Amino acid sequence: MALRRETFESARVADFWTGSVSDDYRLTEAIRTAGLGIQFAPRAMVATTGECSASEFLSWAVRQLIITRVYRPALWWLGFLAHLLYCGAMLAGVVVVAGGGLWALPILLLGFVPGMWRGVLRERAARVMFPGRAAWFGRYGWVYAWLTPLATWVWLYVFLASSFRRRIEWRGNIYELRSPSMTRLVE
């Protein structure tokens, strides 16, 4: 997020950052509290090109959702309930179809199609945003759509893993997130 120094000072961003581990959520809160708006700037996006293992990704994702649960609990609950409902419906559909209820197959597929279509749209938008990554998209672009059903289950796992924890590990330190304005260094 970019802002002018005058805006930073008048919105008291430094005060909002005190005791915080999340600069993004607290900056957003400071800007909104000041009655100002935030605009999405697509050209400010940067591609992450580093590699990470599945374990590293899951650790990062759980950390992000723990932070979200502490700083924006309503948003966390909305995401959790949406994933729980979607995965529950998907599981029910698979059970019915596996039990011989082929009538449910079109309904099950209708559950997959919108998410997969959004994946196609995300991939197309990413291609436009990152033209220098055309070779990567040519090789891996398909995952945006075809792994969407699996990704939904991964995110449900991440939501569940973030449900009851307030401790995060970041850059070798463990922090306890007591509130949006109170973070304790554990070790």
Question: Which functions belong to the PLM regions below?
Answer:
Residues 2-4:
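Conserved beta strand-loop-helix elements of the APE1-like EEP
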Residues 6-9, 14-76:
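Catalytic donor/gating beta->alpha subdomain of glycosyltransferases that bind UDP-sugars
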Residues 32-33, 55-69, 143-150, 154-161, ...:
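Membrane-interacting alpha-helical segments
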Residues 74-84:
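Select subsegments of transmembrane alpha-helices in polytopic membrane proteins
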Residues 82-167:
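Membrane-embedded multi-pass helical conduit in multi-pass membrane proteins
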Residues 182-187:
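Short, surface-exposed, low-complexity cationic segments
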